[in-house]
Amino acid sequence: MKRWKRGAAMLLCLCMMTALLAGCGRGRSGESTASVVMTGSVSTVDPAYATTPAERTLVLHLFDNLYRWTAEGAVPAAAHTYDCTDNEDGTQTYTFHLRRDGKWSDGSNVTAADFVYAWRRLVSPETDSPEAEILSMVAGYEDAHAGDPEALGVYAEDEHTFVVTLSTMCPYFVDAVCTAAATMPVQQKAVEGGEGWSASRTWFVGNGPYRRTGDWSDSLFATLVKQEDHYNARQVRADRIEIRFKSAAEAAKDAGTADAVIGAAGEDGTYGGSSTVGVLLINQMATNMDRTELRQAMSLVIDRDAAAGTLGADYAAAEGLVPHGIRTAGGEEFRAVNGAVIDCEADTYTDRCSQALELMTQAGLRRPEALISLGTVTLLYRNTPAQTALAQRLQKVWQEKLGLSVTLQGEDAETYQQLLSSGAFTLALTELDALYNDASAYLDLWRSGDTRNYALIYMNAYNILMRVAAASTSAEARDAYLKDAEWLLLDTANVIPLYEKEQAYALRGDVTGVVSDGMGAWYFGALWRVEQ
């Protein structure tokens, strides 16, 4: 199993604050300039459409949400305080009090109406944002997403008071939703000023600590300059941030010279959290897969390190359904706190295969004629080169270790999604991505009746655990319920985690203050160089 140096940037930032107290430098000149290299490119900085780590990283600098995620957790940003009220009908009302000195880059005031407009726009079917579901906990979301944006439970009580009603309790609402790139405010005048407003020097307006300058047409380079009139300008350490977007191979060459390299790091790099988890789904309605022992055996014989290696260097064996980088309600990393649910160690693989054979015996499936009685077992997957290679590896290991024959069914993206979402499969490979940083983003999917429960799983005990977790007012209790829910789900082996995608990064030795959201996006405004 790979032994990478893992780093939650939040912890990294905290650990190095002591060094900061000993002495700080302003960099190589009077102006503090941060040099950053990221993999990928940027096609938009419109919060409703920014989906890649590079795009969301720029959004985090050009806009301010109600709160901002930092090394100390969620801290006030566009809002300076909020109140939360539990209503008699089970809903919750959050009242955010916006700071009066919040400004757009055109000098106008940031108001509650800007947030109302942005959130309604995000969920509107006309916008067709891939991030719309991040507001699914807001009252009226279903009606709003169906075509009536004004049904969304948000309104401006006055210019500086933004009110949100949630249909149910949502413990991660402030920390994960109100800090996200997707839910940033946008100015209606700017958005409606012209198509492609977010890429237009003429029409773009942001309210963040930085503004973009230089050549806006260059998708491989972005220069960000501190907004001197930003309310928090004194706390923004980097006066200028220069971000170059490169391929992984090219970016890796900058490790050690650039202040931060994100998405590539070379042999000595650190790996941080991303939001992607690859899983094998076993349809609960497939009668030939109804024996728990069979499903557990299929999981045990999978060499997850080898499976991850099939996909590339940025993939690692999954230790659970919730990947590294995802936080608990208490702000710690869920995986670090709860440990591995799945044994991926190379030195125990032989024992796991022996255990799998014992399970096959218990299921009455050791004899060839018994396996034949299962009929055709088909594995559905997208016919990309990487997923095809993974499917072939699984097919081979199940045949060699269990004697189980599996037929491969590779489909184009559209056909694959139709079959997956309709439950027309026995086995299926898929990837899960979270819209917000909370374990429930991976665990809510498998509640009975959830439209994303493609494996058609029904477990009453699991449903109860998830309901109790959602209603819990104790962060510690909620984390415990989610831990139990993950264990229960994986023990039934209808959802089998295979790999997680991680993000390599390298910080120059004298750099501190860089913060990751745990899902691939970064904030460099607090970047500082420690005096050597």
Where are the regions a protein language model picked out?
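Aromatic- and charge-enriched surface segment that lines or borders ligand/interaction sites
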Residues: 81-134, 163, 288-290
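Detector for C-terminal structural segments
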Residues: 301-332, 386-395, 420-532
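Extracellular/periplasmic solute-recognition and catalytic clefts
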Residues: 213-225, 236, 240-286, 305-311, ...
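N-terminal lobe/hinge region of extracytoplasmic solute-binding protein
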Residues: 37-89, 205
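Structural transition elements
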Residues: 315-363, 384-388
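Gly/Pro-rich hinge or "lid" segments in bacterial periplasmic/extracellular proteins
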Residues: 149, 166-242
